[in-house]
Structures are given as C-alpha cells and as structure tokens.
Amino acid sequence: DYTIVVQTSTGPLQLNKITSFKSKQDVTDVRVKRLDGITDHVRFFDGWSGSFDIERQDAAVDRFFAGLEQGYYSGINEQPAQIYETIQEANGAVSQFRYDGVLMTLADAGNRAGDATVKQSINFVASRRILVS
C-alpha cells in the first residue's frame, strides 16, 4: 500500500486518485582512464526524477499549475515542494521517504472525451530522496 503526499509552499496539493507513481535515481557516471590502462568509475549523484498519474477529480492540479505559470510571468520565483512517499510493507513495517527540492511539471493535462475519465500526468525532479523511517 502506497501513500503519496505533495507538500507545496502554499500547502498540500490534494491528489485524490493517484493511479501510478514512478521514481528513479539520477546519476552521472564518469569514466577515468588511468595510464596503466585500467578504467575507474566515479559516480556523481544528480538527484531524483519521476512521474505520477492521476484521475482528474477536480480543478486542484489545474489551478496549482496555473498559479505557477502566473507567478512565473509576474516575476515570482517558484518555491520547491516536497513529496512524501509512505509504503506499507508486506511484513507490516512502514517505510517513508521524502523527496526534497521538488519541481513539478504538468506533463499531460489530460484528454477530454465524452465516455472516459481525464487522466493527467505530472513529472518531477528532486534534489534528494531521504529515508525518513
């Protein structure tokens, strides 16, 4: 069982029906070729990125991103968000991770059709993912 909470600078962003959540660690791998012919590798951690899909229930997501865009054109710097990922493990334990320095983009505002729900996609980048518990 997963719970995702998005905390923005203006309060929590209510995402009522999250249908998928995906994240990955971003790294840069640098190859160092030594004079003796052996290749060493140096890894630099470059944060995290991911996406989540939701079923549109109300205008919360649309209003949030409209506010970000309005702020941008008004010269207001975007404040990063946080994502809290809580996992109920199979053995009953609870794991919680926090993504810091999160910037989100509305990758897909959804397709409107007469006989279907509206699926929206949000992409994100984060500075770090920290184990909380």
Predicted segments with their positions:
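Solvent-exposed edge beta-strands and adjacent loop segments
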Residues: 1-64, 94-121, 131
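Short, acidic/charged, Gly/Pro-enriched secondary-structure junctions
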Residues: 66-98
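Residues on the solvent-exposed faces and adjacent turns
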Residues: 126-128
